[in-house]
C-alpha cells in the first residue's frame, strides 16, 4: 500500500487573523479542506479522515509563507487523514494511503510515484507544479480568500505591472 506523510512537531504560533489559514490543508474531490491545529486535536481520537470518491488530491501543512505537502500519483484512489499524535509535545501529521494497494507478482516489480513540495508559496511555482504533474487546485495552498475568482486575476495583473514598471 503506497503511502506518504508530513509531520509537524509542536504547535506553531499563528497570526490569529481570520483572513489567513495556517494549519493542515488538502484538496480532495477537487475541493479545498482546511483544518486548524485545534480542530485536529479535538477530532474523534485526534484523527480526521477523508475518503474522496475521485482519484488524486494532495495534503500538507501551510503557514503564512511556506507549504509542506505530499502529492501522490493522481491516477489512484487514496484515503487522506489529518492527525494529532500523543507525546510530550504536540505533533501533527497529514498522510495518505493507497486504498487499493498494489499487487506484486513473483519476479515482477511495481512502481508508485509521489512528490513532496516543501518551500515558499510562490504562485508561478505552484501553477507550474499543477500543470506539470496534474495536481488539482494546487494554487489553493495560497489563501486568496473568499473572492478567489477576483483576487487571483488581480494578483496576476499587479504582478504583470510590476514586471513592466518595477518597484519604485
List each model region and its residues.
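Soluble non-transmembrane domains of integral membrane proteins
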Residues: 1-138
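Interfacial loop/helix-cap signal at membrane boundaries in integral membrane proteins
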Residues: 117-168
Amino acid at each position: 500500500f503506497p503511502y506518504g506523510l508530513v509531520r509537524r512537531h509542536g504547535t506553531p504560533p499563528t497570526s490569529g487573523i481570520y483572513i489567513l489559514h495556517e494549519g493542515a490543508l488538502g484538496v480532495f474531490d477537487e475541493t479545498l479542506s482546511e483544518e486548524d491545529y485545534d480542530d485536529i486535536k479535538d477530532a474523534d481520537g485526534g484523527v480526521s479522515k477523508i475518503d474522496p470518491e475521485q482519484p488524486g488530491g494532495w495534503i500538507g501543512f501551510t503557514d503564512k509563507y511556506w507549504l509542506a505537502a505530499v502529492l501522490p500519483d493522481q491516477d489512484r484512489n487514496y484515503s487522506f487523514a489529518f492527525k494529532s499524535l500523543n507525546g510530550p509535545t504536540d505533533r501533527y501529521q497529514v498522510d495518505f494511503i493507497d486504498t487499493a494497494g498494489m499487487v506484486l507478482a513473483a519476479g515482477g516489480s511495481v512502481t508508485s510515484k509521489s512528490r513532496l513540495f516543501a518551500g515558499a508559496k510562490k504562485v508561478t511555482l505552484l501553477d507550474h507544479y499543477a500543470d506539470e504533474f496534474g495536481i488539482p487546485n494546487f494554487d489553493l495552498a495560497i489563501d486568496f480568500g473568499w473572492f478567489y475568482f477576483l483576487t487571483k486575476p488581480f494578483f496576476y495583473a499587479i504582478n504583470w505591472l510590476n514586471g513592466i514598471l518595477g518597484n519604485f
